[in-house]
Every structure is written in C-alpha cells, then in structure tokens.
C-alpha cells in the first residue's frame, strides 16, 4: 500500500484503449499532438508548443508514490450502554462515482501493519492482532485493509501458493464482523516512507531478474529499481515461461479460489497492485539508499531494453525515428527542481515542445496500457463474486504549482498546466467499473513547503473533478500517519466532495476512506479518542448537523468504557 509522502499519477489522453486483450500495436499508437483533444474543465486550453526542441537531448544536470460492495457497509453496534447506531452504507456500482442517496456517510477502513503475516506464513503477534481488531470493531470502523504479498504467498516456486496466515487472519475478520479490502501486492515492501519491514519479490522472480537485469525499471544512468517488474516486460514470457501479467492473473485466480467463501461477505474489495507501493506509477522517486529526497522531481524510468524497444517502435511510427533511442537526458537528476533543468523549466522547456509531447504521451500511455491489461484480468477473475475492484493512484503534490508538474510527469502522469493527466486514468478505470483510490487526502496546501509550490488540496480537487467527469467512484487514503483533529477535519472536508461543478448539488461523497494505519500510537488514549470521534463523524455523512463537541463527548464516554480493550491492544502491539 501507499506509504510515501504522497503520490499521485496522471496519464495521457491519447486514443482510447479498447477493453480486452492488448496488442503490441496498442503500445505504439501515438498520434501527433494536433490529433488529440485537450482535457476537460479547469485546465488552460491555450496550449502552444514552443521553445527549443531538446533533440538531441542535453547532458543531465547532476544535483544534490463492488461490482457491488452491497455488504461493505453494515450496521455496527456500540455496546456497554452507549447505544446502537444503524447505518446502511454501500459503495456505488457505477454512475457518478461515490454518489449516495441522502449523504449516508463514508465507511472507514483501517490499514493493517505491513507484517501482519510473517515470512513463515503465520499471523504475526496473534494476541495483539485479535485485541486490536476487536478495538477497531468497537469503534465502528467498517473494516480493514490487508496487503496480500506476492513475495510471501508464491515465495517458493511458480504456481505454489501458501495462504497460511491469511486464512487465519481473514477468518478472524469474519468472526468479528469486519469487512476486508484485500490488496494484491505485487511489489516489494521496503524502500518507501513508512516501510518498517522488508518483503522481497518471490525468490524465483528475483532469480530471473538477476539473470536478466532489464526486467527491472532502469533510469538513464543505469540504476536499477527492483520494487516491481518493469511494465516493458508485461507481455513477454520472462518469468519461468509466464509473462508478468499472467503471473498476476494466476495469483488473483488462486486467491479467488481459496477465499471464494469469503468473497462478497467479508472480502468486499480487491485492490490490484500495479507498481511500487502498490500504486499505478513508475518508481520515479525511490527513497532507498537516499536516491531521492522530497521534494525532488524524480527521474524517468524507461531505460530497460524492453521499454526502449517500445520507444524506438513508437518513434518510427510517429515519423521521427531519431527520437527513439533515448528519453530526454536534459531532465535533470532525482533531487533537482524544475527550473534547474532544460526539459522541465517554465520558459522554453522541452516538456512543452513537439518532442516533449511525443515522449510524455508514449511514457504515460505505457502506464495506462499496463493498468488496462491487469484490470482486464482482474475484472474477468472476480466477475460476479460480489467484490469491487480498485486501483491506487499516488498523490504527487509537490511542484504542482509549476507549469510542467515535473514529479507527476516522471511518475507517468501526463499532467501539466495545459493538460489533465487524471481524466484518462479515471476513464480507464470506468471501463472496468473500478474505484479510483487516491492518497494525500489529509494534507493542506499551507502545511507543505510553499517554495516547492506544493498543492495537495488543489490536486485532490482536480482528481475529484476527473472522477466526476468519468463517472467513477472515488475513495481516499491519508499518505502519512496523522492523529490530530486538524488532519481529521481535512479528511472530512475532502471526503464530502463539495465541488462547485457538482451536478446541480447532487449528493456525492467518497465511497470509502482507508486510514493509515493500525499501530501502537493509534491506541494511545488521546489519539484513540480523536480517532473514535473521527470515525463517528465520517459515518454520519455530510448531512449531519451535530456539532463536533457533541460527537467528542460521545467519543470520550466510549473511550472510557472500552479503555481495558484499547489498553490491551496498545500493550500487545508494543510487545
């Protein structure tokens, strides 16, 4: 799951991809910029490519992230004299994403610890897990989010799946009446903010990457990133005779077959991992070994031989074969800022030239095609199983106020001052009835470094408008752990989706919010009281007229009554 400072992605708006089987030619269909339409509202349409064509590129400047969830929102009871609250909340299947009848509130899920299942395929800290889940249930949360790690389940050999600890953990959730968002985590754990443990890719996959290093994402300096298999190899039988996409599909099919009895009742959502930190993006800002530090612009990740082969073919199809040998090498280094570089600078930057449009269109379309392939498999595998499919998009809010939006571009989201990079993603998800899950919901613009022109609130607003236009449900997560009322208030505000363009005032809220994360800090008395009040307020929805003080008084009484249970959870997790 996404743990980074906050990531989001975007993509290009090229020719729509037909759902179903992808072909090699679909990777190469890049039309000249004049043949593509500009994006929807809120974006400047006076686009003109100008400035010098950076071809040949300059040398780099070195510098210092249900078909129907009908049961996803059941009633919960608060015992010990506090009364019972009945709320029926459901994910919306289609239409205007997240729209509900009468503003019925936003269900809250809580992310489980990354190491909830051990490397030995058992439940980690079993006693702590049970006490913690009981506490969460008593607080009124809808359910939990669990990483189902590829590197744990299919660790030993291809096609051999050990569901060990997951069987026990999911049965415990069922027993307690908690719903589950299961994340198909095809990435490595370790190397991102908040990654407290290391869970590598399956050993047999690592062996194949060792034999063929080009299976790893690669930057222009030859640095390899092993968090996730390069999308350039998606359709090649490079993993013991199977393609990466086939491996992901086989894993999801095995999960479905093993947990069929829980799908639709306990397991209500399948979040499909599509990149580093489980997000649909390139690993453009890797934090391992200090390669990238916030708020650097990151670097393009398309220099493995498979991606370069696709770029070469795309350039030939476009009629500019000289553009096919490399990506822009004047785009700076990981920790540069946009104005440090020729490619991303405001005036005359290569991003705003014909070459820049060609490259960024190809780069972002490769990411869209990757998502389309995996979603097509997921949709067919989980069809009629009563679960909703979701995809996580990173909240990349730094340098959002610049013209080029450099960090979004290197991550694969073709989002600039003149182009909406999130609508194409939303449209792709809409074709598969999937949920658009977005991070950095808790952040406010003024909390972030203003010299880096960070704007998480404006970014969330843009994404909300894109999902509204595409009629796709929007869900949210906080990017960093927060326990304060100020962050909770921002989440409440963002989840209400109060947009000026909101279809004549029709009620629309996020379909769900997932809170990062369950840990000892959450169960500290002060934090727990604020969290309980937050969950209550989220459940009441936008139409609630109760003041926060009233909700907090209820929460205080609740915390007092359930104190022994919460203390047990805190102590057990600490040890």
UniProtKB/Swiss-Prot annotation:
Transit peptide: 1-41
Xref: SUPFAM superfamilies: (Trans)glycosidases
Positions where Phosphoserine occurs in the chain: 55, 59
Enzyme superclass (EC): hydrolase
Main location: plastid
Activity control mechanisms: Redox regulation; active in reducing conditions, inactive in oxidizing conditions. Thioredoxins f1, m1, and y1 mediate the reversible reductive activation of oxidized BAM1.
Tissue specificity as recorded in UniProt: Expressed in leaves, roots, flowers, pollen, and seeds.
Reactions that this protein is recorded to catalyse: Hydrolysis of (1->4)-alpha-D-glucosidic linkages in polysaccharides so as to remove successive maltose units from the non-reducing ends of the chains
Protein name as catalogued: Beta-amylase 1, chloroplastic
The organism of origin for this protein: Arabidopsis thaliana
